[in-house]
Amino acid sequence: MIKHVVCHRSRDKAEAYKIAPMLNALMGKVPSLRSMETGIDFMDSVRAYHMVLIATFDDRAGLDEYATHPEHMKVKEYIHSVLESSVSVDFEC
């Protein structure tokens, strides 16, 4: 199993409330996506990111499919239009 974890900071935290449902809606649209969990930060510390996504895939090929899937690319394009910074980690478990 592969976990794909991404933390986003937008120029405006309100964007996280738009992005989370867009990411969650990818379930059922991207065949290799096994689960999608999103969360919005409530601590508002200066070092916090606004939101996190945790997605799971059966294998690296599934993650690769997700990365280039047209539905994911639409969401990614929007995220990049409002993004200040992000970090990600992909790991096998």
Identify the role of each PLM range.
Residues 72:
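NUDIX/MutT-family hydrolases
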Residues 79-86:
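Short glycine/proline-enriched turn or capping motifs at secondary-structure junctions
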Residues 67, 76-79:
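Short, flexible helix/strand-to-coil boundary loops that buttress conserved ligand/catalytic motifs
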